[in-house]
Amino acid sequence: MATATYPPPPPYYRLYKDYSENPNSAPEPPPPIEGTYVCFGGNYTTEDVLPSLEEQGVPQLYPKDSNLDYKNELRSLNRELQLHILELADVLVDRPSQYAKRIGEISSIFKNLHHLLNSLRPHQARATLIHIMELQIQQRKQAVEDIKRRREEAQRLLKDAYLTLDGQ
C-alpha cells in the first residue's frame, strides 16, 4: 500500500489551470461581507462604530459635550485614578471588606479612559496618514532632484567625452 507524502491539492485548483495564459479565466473573488458575521463563535460587524459607555453599562465620568477637551479630561481622569488607587490602599489597610466598591470605581475610571482614547483613534489615524503622505511627497521630490542632478552630470560627462573625441 503506497502512501503519499503530501495530501492531494484541493479540487478547486482546476479553476486556475489556465491562469498563466488568461488571467481573466479565474473566478471572481466573493463579494465583501456586509453587516454581521460569525467568526470563531463570536458575532462581529463590519461597521466600525465605537459603542457608547451607556451601551456598555458604564457610567460616563466626563461631560457629554461635542467640544470636549480630550487632553484635560484625560488628565483629570488620570488624577482621579491615582486618587482612587491611593484610597484603595487605605481601604485595604483599614477596612479590607470594603475593597470591592473601590475596585468597581477604578474599573469605571479605566473604562472611561479607554473610551476617550478609543474615540481619538480616527483622528490619530488621519494624522498618521497625513504624516506618511507628506514624507512620501518629500521623498519623491528628493528623488526627482537626484534624477535631475544625475542627468546634468551625465550630460556634462557626455559633453566632455564628445569634446575629448572631437579634439583628437
Curated annotation (Swiss-Prot):
GO biological process assignments: de-etiolation; regulation of transcription by RNA polymerase II; regulation of unidimensional cell growth
InterPro entries named in the record: Med7/Med21-like (IPR037212), Mediatior_Med7 (IPR009244), Mediatior_Med7_sf (IPR044888)
Keywords: Coiled coil, Nucleus, Transcription, Transcription regulation
GO molecular function annotation: transcription coregulator activity
Coiled coil spans: 64-92, 132-166
Keyword Metal-binding: no
GO CC terms of this entry: mediator complex
Compartments it resides in: Nucleus
PANTHER family: MEDIATOR OF RNA POLYMERASE II TRANSCRIPTION SUBUNIT 7
Oligomer status and interactors: Component of the Mediator complex. Interacts with MEE14/CBP1.
Family note: Belongs to the Mediator complex subunit 7 family.
Function: Component of the Mediator complex, a coactivator involved in the regulated transcription of nearly all RNA polymerase II-dependent genes. Mediator functions as a bridge to convey information from gene-specific regulatory proteins to the basal RNA polymerase II transcription machinery. The Mediator complex, having a compact conformation in its free form, is recruited to promoters by direct interactions with regulatory proteins and serves for the assembly of a functional pre-initiation complex with RNA polymerase II and the general transcription factors.
Protein name: Mediator of RNA polymerase II transcription subunit 7a
Organism: Arabidopsis thaliana
UniProt lineage: Eukaryota, Viridiplantae, Streptophyta, Embryophyta, Tracheophyta
Gene: MED7A
